[in-house]
Amino acid sequence: MKAVVDAAGRIVVPKPLREALGLQPGSTVEISRYGAGLHLIPTGRTARLEEENGVLVATGETTIDDEVVFGLIDSGRK
């Protein structure tokens, strides 16, 4: 997908990517240089490991449903 950098240096993240990553107005992201490109990672998501019945299980407050998972899979295929 292509995006344009405006005069103020802003980039609009295309809607399919925002939806796939769960980005909403006010979401924060970590942005860094990655080779000849940029690496953009949503922040503020928490996950931790807790023991349940002797097994470590990832828990957190971020909800992920099938739509988010399929969106991530589809965005990785394009």
UniProtKB/Swiss-Prot annotation:
Alphabetic keyword roster: DNA-binding, Toxin-antitoxin system
Domain of life: Bacteria
An example molecular function term from Gene Ontology annotations: DNA binding
InterPro entries named in the record: SpoVT-AbrB_dom (IPR007159), SpoVT-AbrB_sf (IPR037914)
Domain SpoVT-AbrB: 1-45
Keyword Iron: no
Quaternary structure and partners: Interacts with cognate toxin VapC27 and non-cognate toxins MazF6 and VapC40. Interaction with MazF6 and MazF9 partially neutralizes the toxins.
Function noted in UniProt: Antitoxin component of a type II toxin-antitoxin (TA) system. Cognate toxin is VapC27. Upon expression in E.coli partially counteracts the ribonuclease activity of non-cognate toxins MazF6 and MazF9.
Family stated for the protein in its record: Belongs to the VapB family.
Protein name in the entry: Antitoxin VapB27
Taxonomic classification: Bacteria, Bacillati, Actinomycetota, Actinomycetes, Mycobacteriales
Gene: vapB27
